[in-house]
């Protein structure tokens, strides 16, 4: 009834504007004829094997507990918390020894429980930088800025690679250390800020989802419809995601 009320309002408005049309035979997506046609065509497509069930990240309102269309999303400048995180390498990194870490930077710390990969750009230069007893892998270009932000002033470069050299190396999840995740390649990685090593959570972002699909990494989102972490988030279970920041 609500939708049909506004159909009538629109129709009368168009008539007053002098617009011609089949006003008594409107094109309505809620009409039984339209719905039955969609079902029939969908069935034909299904029979070709082109339909499958999967998961992907979408815009979601935790207050309304409903999906949002792109047209409903508005962006505003805001200050977000950011964090540098080191993921301990799970496989040998050429030219290094001891404790080696891939360092990421993110402005969405709450997505870290859903981390499933670290993305690097295949063509960027990366360095292994030793500081004390630890070695950090990050973009050669961004390293000075990142190290300064991390409060590290005494360091040396012990090895260099391209992103392609790092593909398929592994690391241990920072929250779930028994989980081993891969280093993958992604053209979405930039040198605008951060470390050139990008925290990748396919269940929380479109670019992460796309690059994850290329590597067969299924999206994972330990968050319920109210924006609260589920038991899959470990010690963060029960917290609203933004408060977890």
Regions found by a protein language model. Give the residues of each.
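Aromatic/His-enriched, Gly/Pro-containing loop or helix-boundary segments
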Residues: 1, 29, 231-245
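Structured alpha-helical segments in the cores of large, soluble enzyme domains
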Residues: 2-14, 217
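Generic structural signal for well-ordered, non-membrane alpha-helical segments
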Residues: 3, 7, 35-38, 245
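NTP-handling and nucleic-acid-processing catalytic cores
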Residues: 16, 20, 32-232, 236
């Amino acid at each position: 009834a609500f939708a049909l009320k506004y159909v009538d309002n629109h129709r009368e408005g168009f008539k007053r504007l002098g617009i011609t049309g089949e006003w008594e035979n409107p094109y309505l997506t809620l009409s039984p004829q339209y719905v039955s046609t969609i079902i029939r065509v969908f069935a034909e497509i299904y029979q070709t094997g082109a339909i499958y069930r999967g998961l992907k990240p979408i815009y979601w309102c935790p207050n309304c507990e409903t999906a949002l269309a792109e047209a409903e999303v508005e962006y505003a400048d805001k200050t977000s918390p950011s964090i540098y995180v080191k993921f301990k390498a799970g496989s040998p990194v050429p030219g290094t020894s001891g404790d080696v870490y891939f360092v990421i930077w993110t402005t969405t710390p709450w997505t870290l429980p859903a981390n499933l990969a670290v993305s690097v750009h295949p063509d960027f230069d990366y360095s292994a930088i030793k500081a004390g007893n630890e070695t950090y892998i990050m973009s050669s270009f961004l390293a000075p800025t990142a190290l300064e932000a991390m409060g590290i002033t005494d360091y040396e470069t012990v090895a260099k690679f391209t992103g392609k050299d790092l593909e398929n190396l592994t690391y241990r999840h920072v929250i779930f250390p028994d989980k081993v995740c891969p280093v993958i390649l992604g053209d979405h990685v930039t040198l605008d800020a951060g470390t050139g090593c990008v925290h990748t959570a396919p269940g929380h972002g479109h670019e992460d989802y796309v690059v994850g699909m290329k590597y067969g990494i299924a999206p994972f989102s330990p968050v319920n419809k109210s924006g609260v972490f589920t038991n899959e988030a470990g010690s963060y279970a029960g917290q609203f995601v933004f408060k977890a920041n």
